């Protein structure tokens, strides 16, 4: 009997004052932790509500931009024609740059072209811009038109190019030749005139020549020397006959 009663009644150990205070303090700490957990849950709920509000506002903004795009004109799809997207972007960029350059290009080019065309159209103008230099006065000969221009002689003609005009005059009954005026090279001698007259007169006899109707030149004299000394009206007068006429 005594053993059963001891088992049924639990043994109680008396607690000191310090242990009781510790137990009470732990209970208070537990209550404080519970309050902080509750506050944390409330703050988390507020954060979730704010996130939901921000999401809703962003959705509204997105819907607003979507509606604007929907109201605008539809963009036509870019025809790729088998080209890569990188190449297409490069082509579009180059076209934009070219358009920008065309807009920013100065207008001086068109004006300069117009001025050049207007200058070349006026042929009568003798200004340097007309493209035609004025004719030199030295290239024009008095008494000639402006179209019949002659090149200025930069160097004197050589003896082989110089010409001498000879006028033949028959003496007495000597036959007349036609024409009477001839042009011959100045470096020739009198002998060529004798041969020429003998051929024209068809005579085997000797032909005699006279200058100024006064003296007979030697066959080896140059015509240029005789012309410079005895010319008359830019001609050398040579008289001829088939017999001795003077002296």
Curated annotation (Swiss-Prot):
Regions of compositional bias (Basic and acidic residues) in chain numbering: 1-11, 39-49, 96-106
Annotated GO MF terms: Atg8-family ligase activity
Compositionally biased region (Polar residues): 50-66, 146-158
Subcellular location(s) per record: Preautophagosomal structure membrane
Membrane topology: Peripheral membrane protein
Cross-link for Glycyl lysine isopeptide (Gly-Lys) (interchain with K-144 in ATG5), residue positions: 247
Alphabetical list of InterPro entries matching this protein: Atg12 (IPR007242), Ubiquitin-like_domsf (IPR029071)
Keywords: Autophagy, Isopeptide bond, Membrane, Protein transport, Transport, Ubl conjugation pathway
Signal sequence interval, chain numbering: none
Major localization class: membrane
GO biological process: autophagosome assembly; autophagosome maturation; autophagy of mitochondrion; glycophagy; piecemeal microautophagy of the nucleus; protein transport
Pfam family of the protein (one): APG12
GO cellular component term, pick one: phagophore assembly site membrane
Keyword Protein transport: yes
Region (Disordered): 1-158
Ranges annotated as biased composition (Low complexity): 107-130
PANTHER family per the UniProt record, alphabetical: AUTOPHAGY PROTEIN 12, UBIQUITIN-LIKE PROTEIN ATG12
Role, per record: Ubiquitin-like protein involved in cytoplasm to vacuole transport (Cvt), autophagy vesicles formation, mitophagy, and nucleophagy. Conjugation with ATG5 through a ubiquitin-like conjugating system involving also ATG7 as an E1-like activating enzyme and ATG10 as an E2-like conjugating enzyme, is essential for its function. The ATG12-ATG5 conjugate functions as an E3-like enzyme which is required for lipidation of ATG8 and ATG8 association to the vesicle membranes. ATG12-ATG5 rearranges the association to the vesicle membranes.
Family of this protein: Belongs to the ATG12 family.
Complexes and interactors: Forms a conjugate with ATG5.
Name under which the protein is recorded: Ubiquitin-like protein ATG12
Source organism of this protein record: Scheffersomyces stipitis (strain ATCC 58785 / CBS 6054 / NBRC 10063 / NRRL Y-11545) (Yeast)
Organism classification: Eukaryota, Fungi, Dikarya, Ascomycota, Saccharomycotina
Gene this protein is translated from: ATG12
């Amino acid at each position: 009997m005594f053993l059963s009663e001891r088992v049924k009644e639990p043994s109680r150990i008396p607690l000191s004052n310090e242990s009781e205070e510790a137990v009470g303090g732990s209970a208070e700490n537990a209550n404080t932790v519970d309050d902080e957990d509750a506050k944390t849950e409330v703050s988390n709920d507020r954060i979730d509500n704010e996130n939901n509000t921000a999401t809703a506002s962003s959705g509204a903004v997105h819907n607003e931009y979507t509606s604007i795009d929907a109201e605008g004109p539809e963009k036509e799809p870019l025809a790729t024609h088998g080209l890569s997207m990188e190449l297409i972007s490069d082509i579009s960029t180059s076209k934009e740059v070219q358009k920008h350059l065309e807009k920013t290009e100065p207008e001086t080019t068109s004006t300069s072209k117009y001025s050049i065309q207007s200058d070349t159209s006026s042929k009568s103008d003798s200004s340097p811009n007309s493209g035609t230099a004025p004719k030199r006065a030295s290239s024009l000969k008095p008494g000639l038109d402006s179209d019949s221009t002659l090149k200025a002689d930069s160097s004197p003609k050589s003896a082989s190019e110089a010409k001498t005009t000879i006028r033949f005059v028959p003496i007495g009954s000597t036959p007349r030749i036609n024409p009477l005026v001839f042009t011959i090279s100045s470096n020739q001698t009198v002998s060529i005139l004798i041969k020429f007259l003998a051929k024209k007169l068809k005579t085997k006899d000797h032909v005699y020549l006279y200058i100024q109707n006064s003296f007979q030149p030697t066959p080896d004299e140059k015509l240029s020397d005789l012309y410079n000394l005895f010319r008359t009206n830019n001609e050398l007068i040579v008289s001829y006959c088939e017999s001795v006429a003077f002296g």
